[in-house]
């Protein structure tokens, strides 16, 4: 329940969605279907420019409802690459995708802007060169997002208590996930 509350808190407490993106050429893997769906959601978001970021997060999430849950979506390739899949997802990818779409749309961005946002959100310091660069834990993802100014953790205002419990198993044992 606490994880669910944290994810909901993050989902509805998006801030700085109007901030400037670190736009760079991004190397990614996607499919024509995934790209088309992303462009469709971007167009829907850009058609409602006056909406608050939280409302746009909900809009993006509703636009993506019905896509199947697929575990291990990012482990399909032999080497680490930014994988952009909207036609299949897992829970954290869903949140990352919605946030990236909203941030790109608020900058009147295109698919490339979305890819750049996703890279910044999914990988430590926006660097995707190896499995260990990926933010594997929701807690680390949230802390990195707070550091970048893309999310605000409102758990404390909802009665949550911060626990500083370092987690690093996946990053320290990448061979266990090959």
Question: Regions from the language model: what does each represent?
Answer:
Residues 67-178:
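Acidic/His-rich structured neighborhood in mature extracellular/periplasmic domains
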Residues 10-18:
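Hydrophobic h-region of N-terminal signal peptides that target proteins for export
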Residues 1-4:
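Positively charged n-region of N-terminal signal peptides that target proteins for export
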Residues 22-93:
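Cationic-aromatic interfacial patches
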